[in-house]
């Protein structure tokens, strides 16, 4: 859906938004079972989805956590949803459709994040970089997507002048997500712990097709032209990873 808005086809994104909105119903079941976050009748306390979904309510990780567990997928979807407003400026749609979705997703992460004292971060845990490497806490992929979600949620809530208490809680965690770090080779870290002697490089491929740790560069807005060191590290990351991969990852790298 990346081209839908930029090609002036925002109306083609509405079925996607409706699909995600409907997914929240079953996603609340997944949030209860996998994260202990319960929404009783009429409540919208958080929903969960991973790398697979169907029109029939599939929101669980699948049969292999290595590629299936991806709780920040809900945050990534919200970026596509919020983009509708950024391109159309439809205030009614923002208030009635988009904001409730953003709010519930932000509430999930406000509850699900764990504080890691060693790194002074609020982290996603457990955390997999999609189909690559080992399990960690607070990897760059998850942290970047939650950063984007919280950024967008606070922007909308402040614009609508609503839910000040939740915004305050989200802001406190947002400031300690700390998604971007540069490793000793001058590249963006994919895993926070990767320079540690205890870090295992099991399953790591230098030319892996995904560059999940650059999700904040595209399609996210985490990187800034005023942060030259991160942009140079991102360039080094792309050069190191190479141009191989399947269709989706090639499009991601090109963008």
Predicted regions and their residues:
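Active-site core of glycosidic bond-cleaving carbohydrate-active enzymes
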Residues: 3-29, 33, 37-42, 66-91, ...
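Carboxylate-rich helix-loop segments that flank metal/cofactor sites and access channels
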Residues: 39-52
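Acidic/His metal-coordination segments adjacent to aromatic residues that form catalytic metal sites
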Residues: 49-69, 125-139, 199-200
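Structured mid-domain segments that build the active-site/substrate or prosthetic-cofactor binding neighborhood
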Residues: 80-83, 102, 107-112, 218
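Serine-hydrolase-like catalytic core of hydrolytic proteins
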Residues: 88, 94-108, 116
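Acidic/histidine-rich catalytic neighborhood
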Residues: 104-159
